[in-house]
Design a protein with these regions (language model features):
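A cytosolic small-molecule/anion-sensing beta-strand core signal
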Residues: 62-63, 80, 99
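Conserved short histidine dyad/triad with adjacent acidic residue
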Residues: 23, 36-53
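Short acidic-glycine-tyrosine-enriched beta hairpin
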Residues: 73-90
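A short hydrophobic beta-strand segment most commonly corresponding to one strand
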Residues: 39, 58, 86, 100-116
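Glycine- and acidic-residue-biased ligand/ion/polar-headgroup-sensing regions
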Residues: 54-67
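Short histidine-centered beta-strand/loop micro-motifs
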Residues: 29, 47-53, 70, 77-78, ...
Length: 136
């Protein structure tokens, strides 16, 4: 069993801070459970372009408001508390933030915890080496 508090990862390599958002990765590929979980805060007034070409991501909005723009289908969705969106088709998208959005993000395959988006909004696919025999 793994039990962690958000403060356990704050200020560590699993706490990634950028101009538009910061993310604290609570469960990562290092935990070897097949997915990762993080809390991300998208900053008010920011516009963020993302494209998870290597991952499926589920996002659950806990607080804040904004818009999700699906670049592939030219469709805009309103975001607020209780909203979930699932990027299951590697959709290019943009999040426009009206008030700080706090969300819980789940990735498959799991992220290692240090990823940042490249110039295309993509996380690289970083994988851990397999555990030595008898270590699993």
């Amino acid at each position: 069993m793994i039990v962690r508090k958000i403060d356990d990862v704050t200020g560590t390599r699993n706490h990634v801070d950028t101009p538009g958002w910061f993310s604290r990765r609570i469960v990562t590929a290092h935990d070897r459970v097949g997915f990762s979980v993080g809390e991300t805060v998208l900053r008010a007034g920011s516009t963020n372009d993302f494209w998870y070409a290597n991952h499926v991501e589920a996002v659950y909005i806990v607080s804040g408001e904004g818009e999700l723009y699906d670049k592939d289908n030219d469709t805009t969705y309103q975001l607020g508390p209780g909203t979930m969106y699932l990027l299951d088709g590697n959709e290019k998208h943009q999040v426009r933030v009206r008030s700080d959005i706090t969300c819980v993000c789940v990735f498959n395959p799991p992220i290692v915890g240090t990823e940042v988006h490249d110039e295309n909004g993509v996380y690289p696919l970083l994988e851990l080496p397999p555990e030595p025999a008898g270590q699993a």
